[in-house]
Each structure stands twice: as C-alpha cells, then as structure tokens.
A protein has these predicted regions:
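Structured, solvent-exposed acidic/aromatic patches
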Residues: 1-198, 210-217, 242-244, 292
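Long, intrinsically disordered, low-complexity segments
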Residues: 9, 118-119, 239-293
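Active/binding-pocket-proximal capping segment
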Residues: 201, 216-232
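Active-site-proximal region of nucleotide-activated glycan assembly enzymes
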Residues: 205
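Active-site/pore-lining binding-face segments in mid-to-C-terminal subdomains
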Residues: 209, 228, 246
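Cytochrome P450 fold signature focused on the C-terminal beta-domain
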Residues: 232-239
Length: 293
C-alpha cells in the first residue's frame, strides 16, 4: 500500500474506534471513575492518537482540533513538578517512578506477574552493584534544560559507571523502573505511557505555528502552560514569532519527550538530518552515521 493509503486506513480505523468508544452523554467521573492513568481505550484515547497522526500528516488544522478536544475535555491534568506526591517525589517524577499520573491518557498496564520488556535496561544495566549503561545521554540534550527546569531531576542522575574507565555521567533514570516492581527484584521495568497530555500541548503548539495562518500567541501560551507545570518557577509568557517559534517547539519536544520514541518522526517531519559522533570501539563499521535532511 502507498503511504497515503496506509494513513487513510489508520484514519478510517480511528473513525470506527471513536464511534465504538464514545462516552455516554451522562458520563460522570464522580460516579464512574476518572479517565486519566487508564489502561483501557476510550473516546479521548482515540482523539489523542488521531492528533498525533494528523501532526505526522501535516494536517495542521485538524491536529489542532483533536488535540484541543483532549486538552479541553477536563479529564486530564498536567502532572506538577512542584507539588509533592510523596515525601521524595513530585507528581511528575512519581509518573516515572511509580507509573501513576493524571496526565497519562493511555498506558500499557503491567503487574508483577505479567509485564513487558525492561525499557530502562540499556540506559542503566544495574546489577545491584554497578551501572554499566549501553547508552548515555548526549551532552547537547542535557544542556537544553534550563536551571529551573525540574524535569532534569526526574530524567537524569549522575553516576560513576562500573566500566574500567570509571566514567561519571548523567544517566537516564526515566526508565530506571517502577518501585513496586523493584521490590520484587524486577529491574528497569516501567509501564509505557503511550499517550500523555503534554504531547497534546506540543502537537497543538506546532500546528498553530505551521498552519496557513500561524497563531504565535496561542502556540506560546501552550508552551507556557507546559513549562509552568515543569519549572520551579516560570513567570510571564513564552514569546514566539516567525523566527524563533519552531526552534523553541523543537527543543521543547526533546526536553519533554526525551527517549519516548518520537525523535525520528520529528526529524523526518522537520526535514532535518542527524550525525552520530564516531564511537571508540573495536569495529569502525557503523561507528559513525550521518543522515542528510
């Protein structure tokens, strides 16, 4: 099938899913339970996935429409980096350490008796003694975060690795593992948060900027809402214009969605390439890679 036919197949499936999963008119979260942090599909799961697909298709106005449906529904709330969920974790960090969040639209449900792959294995390889990661965060990515951006402490922690060179580096702890699973000696296993509210804000912000009649004010407002939930303090507003808007949004997607599987799609959509820094290893073949835009 062509790419066009493949996308149409997806949109048709989403149309049917929206019909089957439509909420009842009298749906009430007080009596029927919340929709956030769900392992089940519902009408807004479909809207969120459709917004992502429409972004990839560059159908900006429709992406705005469906992201707005999710954002304005009132069923999901950005997890705060400043409000404490426990004595040791903010609500945002708790999303990654305990797999519970008011902004998760849909997650893959795991139990200690039935769980998927260890997402964090390659970033830590902890053996109860040392950490020997296969991959470490790139300096340019870590340096994107501002001083008062509290995502840093949720995503990264400096360790001295167990390798002979004794590298000390900020390692990715975003997927270090659900603490409940760790209690059963199940390491680096986390429930994938496939759809989150923060992504919907980023989808809408990008679509506002890329559409035929850009609205930089609304795009800046969406970035401000997200940063307010992520920073220790974020005063004022995010000023976007034709010259800086996409740079800001591109960086914000890296900072918020780091290592969640979006990067390649983003680079393709933005017509940007990348270059891998040559690695110090025994095999030179594949050690470096450059992909042009």
């Amino acid at each position: 099938a062509s790419l066009k036919d493949s996308y149409q197949f997806i949109l048709d499936a989403l149309d049917r899913a929206a019909e089957l999963l439509e909420l009842e008119e009298d749906f009430d979260t007080d009596t029927q339970g919340t929709l956030y942090d769900s392992i089940y599909f519902n009408e807004y799961t479909v809207h969120a996935l459709r917004a992502r697909v429409l972004l990839y298709m560059k159908r900006w106005d429709e992406a705005i429409k469906y992201a707005t449906k999710v954002i304005d529904s009132g069923y999901y709330y950005l997890s705060s980096c400043t409000r404490a969920a426990t004595s040791s974790a903010s609500y945002y960090k708790y999303m990654w350490t305990n797999d519970f969040s008011t902004e998760a639209i849909w997650k893959v449900g795991f139990t200690v008796n039935a769980y998927g792959g260890a997402l964090g294995q390659v970033f830590a390889n902890y053996d109860y003694s040392t950490l020997r990661p296969d991959y470490v965060p790139a300096t340019w990515a870590v340096n994107l975060y501002d001083m008062n951006d509290l995502r840093v402490s949720a995503f990264f922690q400096s360790f001295t690795t167990g390798y002979s060179h004794g590298l000390t580096w900020p390692l990715l702890i975003k997927y270090f593992g659900n603490e409940s699973f760790t209690n059963y000696n199940i390491l680096h296993v986390s429930m994938p948060k496939v759809l989150r509210l923060s992504e919907q804000y980023l989808i809408r912000a990008e679509a506002y900027v890329q559409c035929d009649q850009p609205d930089y004010g609304k795009a800046g407002s969406d970035i401000s809402v997200l940063r307010t939930a992520r920073y220790s303090s974020y005063g004022g507003s995010t000023s976007l214009n034709k010259e800086n808007a996409m740079d800001v949004i591109e960086q914000e997607r890296v900072k918020e969605l780091y290592m969640e599987g979006f990067r390649l799609h983003d680079l393709k959509r933005w017509h940007k390439g990348f270059e891998r820094t040559p690695q110090d290893q025994s095999l030179s073949n594949g050690s470096s890679l450059k992909v042009e835009k």
